[in-house]
Amino acid sequence: MKTKLILLYGGKSAEHEVSLQTAFSVINALDLEKFEAAPIYITNEGEWIQGPLLSGKLDFVEQLRFSATDTIKLATTESEKSEGEAISPAVLEADGQETVVFPLLHGPNGEDGTVQGLFEVLNIPYVGNGVLASSAAMDKIVMKKIFADAGIPQVPAVAVRLIDWKNYQEEMVAEMEEVLTYPVFVKPANLGSSVGISKATNKKELVDAMTEAFLYDRRVVVEQGVVAREIEMGVLGNDTPVCSVPGEILPEGAVATFYDYKAKYQDNNTALIIPTEVDPEILEQMKEYAIQAFLGLDASGLVRADFFLTEDNQLFLNEVNTMPGFTPYSMYPLLWQETGLPYGALIERLVDLAKERHAAKNALKYKLED
């Protein structure tokens, strides 16, 4: 019997359109001999709309933008529901057929543990990270504490609460200027995109950046700016994760001068070099830190680890992303493609990992014996 793969995409997020592109890519990469593709679209307003079961490839992304005016019928477990009709999240519940949810959502309500909690309550297997890893990695302050506890090197940073900023602004600025040197980067603690992030090169810019960041969160992290290469690595697995080859993001206008790479991908003004050239000892450190971060978060399925590597070979883990970009041209799938795992096979592996984790969870005891 085919596995029913529920694709959950859209959402109340600044990355709504990216999520649609991701769903389009995943659906068109699915082996429909193995999977039954069941799309569920979450509108910008947060309404859940169930689409038709898909029997072939899509031609346009817009085919996934369902609305309440659609009238095509879709057979469900014991009744029929109109495609385009608003539904309850309970539609995710398995109906006897092997079912897995693939959440293709980004940012708040998508990769912060909230929708993952829904899947846990429904006891349905789902691709990617659980509640703990998702929520901890979304919060930059909590994430940094976990990495520090694991002994993973990070750039210096200062965490600031809004109430402290309001009451002790001068003292907070003095503390930051004592610990950090300009330039610094000011980031809301709990946003998954670049919204609210600013670079500050002096005190006035720092104050302005803090004011901007506090519009989006009541907690802010201020990080030391470094001149470094940006190198990323994919991690895949559950209890025994493995790492991909490293990839590098070249800044706008940079020219690739590397000898040893299999592929160079160009996206607007950003060049991706995969695999990139890294000293073998540094590469082993990078793998070690990526796996330590993965296990420290109790991650599962997939994680992308983002590093800084300075000219004098100082290595810093900047952050991890528990739901990285997932179109065929995004860094994470490209890293695995160049490691030997193509896009379609990567999707199938993630579904298998979801099933494995769910089976392990259900094998646990949840009540005391009489």
Curated annotation (Swiss-Prot):
Keyword Nucleotide-binding (UniProt): yes
Name the UniProt key words of this record, in alphabetical order.
Answer: ATP-binding, Cell shape, Cell wall biogenesis/degradation, Cytoplasm, Ligase, Magnesium, Manganese, Metal-binding, Nucleotide-binding, Peptidoglycan synthesis
Provide the cofactor note recorded for this chain's UniProt entry: Binds 2 magnesium or manganese ions per subunit.
Q: ATP-grasp domain: from which residue to which, for each copy?
A: 144-352
List the cofactors.
Mg(2+); Mn(2+)
| GO terms of biological process kind | cell wall organization; peptidoglycan biosynthetic process; regulation of cell shape
GO MF terms held by the record:
ATP binding; D-alanine-D-alanine ligase activity; metal ion binding
Q: In which pathway does it act?
A: Cell wall biogenesis; peptidoglycan biosynthesis
Q: Recorded E.C. number(s)?
A: 6.3.2.4
- Identify the residues that bind Mg(2+) 1: 306, 319
Q: What does this protein do?
A: Cell wall formation.
Q: Which HAMAP family match?
A: Dala_Dala_lig (MF_00047)
Q: What family classification does the UniProt entry report for this protein?
A: Belongs to the D-alanine--D-alanine ligase family.
- PANTHER family, alphabetized: D-ALANINE--D-ALANINE LIGASE, D-ALANINE--D-ALANINE LIGASE A
Protein name as it appears in the record: D-alanine--D-alanine ligase
Q: Which gene encodes it?
A: ddl
